[in-house]
Structures are given as structure tokens and as C-alpha cells.
């Protein structure tokens, strides 16, 4: 299928709006029509090339929410029409940590996060010349449609506005972790926030 996307072809240069070919979801993947995507400071850092990744060309954006259009083989917990938040972490499901119930420390997560590929080592986007265009953190929310791992697509209630839901994929979790886990802020305490995002 065709999808319009903002493609990064050089660090620090404007994104080009391109029509890409998007492959159908493979096993344990979903096709999502993106409704809203936030622009995190991590997206700006990546756009500048400050992460040192070799993933160009790439469709960026990792804070998105949308509606499931199709599911690949093996997907049982999502169906077309479900509202989802796309998460930038997709544990592999088969390493020792994952099978032990500790997918939050998946052994394959960090290497695959910076690869520009999905869990099977390939990308689903192709440009007009048939060349692969990489994914950003499994999400690539700066596209009308995305294919991502089902494990990285979290169902949310239909009544939750998707323009707010997209923030759950990164900034809410990051902010929550900083406040609750790191700073251990207690009810009634005051805090100051100097900046958010990567």
C-alpha cells in the first residue's frame, strides 16, 4: 500500500515528504493508521544526528497513536478498529530475559532499537526507487500508516482522545519514571521542570 511520510535523508536537513510503499504486516505485526504523533526532544536530537546512528534514510517519530487497520499472523490481542498507542520498545519475546518474564530488560532490545529495522531485521518502507527506508524506534509516526510489532502497540480505550494518547508512548512514561522512580516525589511536594525529552 502507499503511505505519505516525512523522510529524513540527511541529518540536520529538512524532512522530505514522500510517497512510500508500505509492506503488509508480517507475523506478530500490525498495520496502524496514524492519527496523531508528538514531536519529542529525542526526535530533534536524532534529526541533528547526535545519536550517531547509521539509519538514513529514516521515517522518524516515536510518540504516536492510531487505529489498527490490519493484523499479521499470530496477533491475537489486537484487531482492526482497536485504538492503540505505539511504543518505542519492542522486546523480542524469545531471549532468556523475555521468556523469564523480564521483557523490560530484553537482551535484543538495545541493538535493534538503533538498527532502523523491525524485529526480523528488515524494514517495511520502500521509496520510489525500491530502496528500503528505515524505521525509527519501531514506530515511524511521521507516516500516515505504519507497520510495527504488535507487542509495541498498546490498546487504549476508544474514548481516550488520540491526540492525548500519543503522549503515552514516550513523554508520559519518561516523566512518570523521573517523578516517581528517580525523584520519588511525594504528594504535597513541589517540583520544578527544566526540560523534557532526550
Region annotations inferred by a language model:
Residues 7-14:
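Extracellular beta-rich ligand/substrate-recognition surface
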Residues 42, 85-89, 170:
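Glycine-rich phosphate/pyrophosphate-binding beta-alpha loops
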Residues 21-37, 50-99, 104, 112, ...:
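Glycine-rich beta-strand-centered segment in the early N-terminal region that forms part
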Residues 87-151:
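Cysteine-cluster motifs in flexible loop/terminal segments that predominantly coordinate metals
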Residues 42-48:
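Cytochrome P450 core scaffold surrounding the K-helix E-X-X-R motif
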Residues 144, 151-153, 157-198:
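Mid-domain Rossmann-like dinucleotide-binding core that forms the NAD(H)/NADP(H) cofactor-binding site
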Residues 2-4:
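Extreme N-terminal starter segment of soluble prokaryotic enzymes
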